[in-house]
Design a protein with these regions (language model features):
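Active-site/pore-lining binding-face segments in mid-to-C-terminal subdomains
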Residues: 197-255
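A short, structured active-site edge motif that brings together acidic residues
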Residues: 89-101
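Active-site neighborhood of phospho(di)ester-bond hydrolases with catalytic His/Asp-centered motifs
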Residues: 37-40, 61-68, 89-91, 146-148, ...
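Conserved beta-strand hairpin/beta-sheet module of binuclear metal-dependent hydrolase folds
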Residues: 1-55, 59, 156-166
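Metallo-beta-lactamase
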Residues: 98-145, 151-220
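Active-site metal-binding motif and surrounding structural segment of the metallo-beta-lactamase
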Residues: 45-90
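C-terminal regulatory/interaction regions
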Residues: 239-309
Length: 309
């Protein structure tokens, strides 16, 4: 495929500190076929529509959702009003939550608080406009169920380009390297996340789009870093399990900063983006802690002995 047919549309939130170069929507235009990946939250739909019009987009054939979290899919229903010919592709587990999003919105408000309000309420998607397909459109886009970040997560392969969503976590460019961290909110299961990563590695993509953030030319390197990070971070959670709850997160962060080169690059992030990442870190660690703390003593000990490749 011709990667010149790709365009990134940044969906910044000026009202929130550090919410720049974080949320993005990706546009692909082939021969008579137009696809948008992750339209973002409701509050950025007006900007997204202006950018699509500026780029000369008159119709969307498909809207592909990597998952249904509010910052990726919350604006889908509103976007359909502007592009009534589009069909939405979503993980089968996520469809009902977008058709009737009341519980999804309630959960988003509970977890994110004021940030959910900044994203905007989730607009329902008509049931006849949303579904799942393993192969999409004349470009032959392939959809893969990749639970881990969420049970309703999908990745999409367009030629040799992988739209990875958050299967490999979050990344940012920093001077002289990259910052990366896992994205493992509660209901995280290590084995499930590793299986999804292994299947994406087996596809051997040549380019990869992170939902957060950017396109990379070394996807296998990034996928392997993400896999090693999961193993390392879960080991850290296991090794700090005996520390009192009030001190555990602080101790775990110190443990990680000593051992994880990519996470240690947090210090190279701009101050506002660093604050944003610290905000989301708590949810990542909670997901891992809930997973590890539910294991038996023997299982936790085995995790403590695991080493990344």
């Amino acid at each position: 495929m011709d990667h010149a047919d790709l365009a990134c549309i940044d969906l910044d939130l000026p009202s929130r500190e550090g919410f720049r170069k974080f949320i993005s929507s990706w546009l692909y235009r082939g021969d008579g076929f137009t696809v948008l990946v992750d339209p973002g939250p409701l509050s950025t739909v007006p900007w997204l529509c202006r950018e699509l019009r500026r780029l000369g987009v008159e119709r969307l054939d498909h809207i592909l959702l990597t998952h249904i979290h509010i910052d990726h899919a919350g604006g889908t229903g509103a976007l359909l009003r502007e592009f009534p010919g589009a069909a939405v592709i979503c993980h089968p587990e996520g469809i009902r939550h977008l058709v009737a999003p009341e519980k999804l919105w309630e959960g988003s408000r509970k977890v994110l608080g004021a940030l959910a309000e900044a994203y905007g309420e989730i607009v329902p998607v008509p049931a006849e406009r949303i579904g799942f397909a393993e192969t999409i459109g004349p470009a032959g886009i392939r959809a893969f169920l990749t639970p881990g970040h969420a049970q309703h997560h999908c990745c999409y392969l367009l030629g040799d380009l992988l739209f990875a969503g958050e299967v490999a976590g979050v990344r940012c460019d920093v001077p002289g390297g990259i910052f990366m961290r896992p994205a493992t909110p509660p209901r995280f299961v290590l084995e499930v996340a590793l299986d999804s990563l292994d299947r994406m590695i087996a596809l051997a993509p040549r380019r990869m789009v992170f939902a957060h953030y950017g396109v990379v030319e070394t996807p296998l390197q990034h996928l392997r870093i993400a896999r090693n990070q999961l193993l390392l971070w879960v080991r850290g959670v296991a090794e700090t399990a005996a520390i009192e709850p009030a001190r555990r997160e602080e101790a775990l962060v110190a443990w990680l900063l000593e051992r994880d080169e990519q996470y240690r690059n947090e210090c190279r992030l701009p101050q506002d983006i660093r604050a944003r990442e610290r905000y989301f870190l708590g949810n990542t660690l909670r997901g891992m802690m809930e997973y590890v703390d539910a294991l038996s003593d023997g299982e936790r000990q085995a995790l403590g002995e695991m080493r990344p490749a």
